Amino acid sequence: MPRRRVVGQRKILPDPKFNSELLAKFINVIMQDGKKSTAEKIIYKALDTVAEKKSEDHLVILEAALENVRPSVEVKSRRVGGSTYQVPCEVRPVRRNALGMRWLVEAARKRGEKSMALRLAGELLDASENKGTAVKKREDVHRMAEANKAFAHYRW
C-alpha cells in the first residue's frame, strides 16, 4: 500500500435527464462493454414504466427500491488458527449502495421478461414493495450474519 497520500473518491457527474448522482451510478452499474447510451435508454425506459404503473416520481421509486435492497451487515471470511470463520461486519454506506445496485441488476438479468428495461422495471417494482430476488438476497445475507453472530468478536 502506498504511504504518501490517501486518494479521494472521484466525483461522479449527475445523469443528464434527472440530474441525480445516484442514477448516474446506477447507469454505470447497468452498462456493459462501455455502451453508456444503451444503459441510459434501459434505465430511463424502466423508470418510465415503473412511474406509469405506480404513479409516483421516478427517483422516489428508485430510492425506495434501493432502500429495501441495501444490506446493513455482511459476513467476511476470517482465518483463525486452522479454521475459517464467517465474521459479521457492518457495511460502509458507499459499499451498501454499490451492493444494492449490483443485486438489483443481477436479479433483473435473471428475470424472464422480454427486454432488459421491462426486467429492471419489474425488479424495481418488486424491490419497492419489499419482495423479489434482490430483497431475498439481502435477507439471506442478513440471516447469514445473524447465524454467525457468535464470531463477531473476531472483527478487525
Swiss-Prot record:
Q: Which organism is it from?
A: Shewanella woodyi (strain ATCC 51908 / MS32)
Per the record, the similarity remark reads: Belongs to the universal ribosomal protein uS7 family.
The job of this chain, per UniProt, is described as: One of the primary rRNA binding proteins, it binds directly to 16S rRNA where it nucleates assembly of the head domain of the 30S subunit. Is located at the subunit interface close to the decoding center, probably blocks exit of the E-site tRNA.
GO CC terms in record = small ribosomal subunit
Gene3D superfamilies named among the record's database cross-references = Ribosomal protein S7 domain (1.10.455.10)
Q: Which Pfam families match?
A: Ribosomal_S7
Q: What is this protein called?
A: Small ribosomal subunit protein uS7
Q: Name one GO biological process term.
A: translation
UniProt keywords, alphabetically: Ribonucleoprotein, Ribosomal protein, RNA-binding, rRNA-binding, tRNA-binding
Q: How does it assemble?
A: Part of the 30S ribosomal subunit. Contacts proteins S9 and S11.
List the molecular function annotations (GO) for this entry.
Answer: rRNA binding; structural constituent of ribosome; tRNA binding
Q: PANTHER family given for it? A: RIBOSOMAL PROTEIN S7 (PTHR11205)
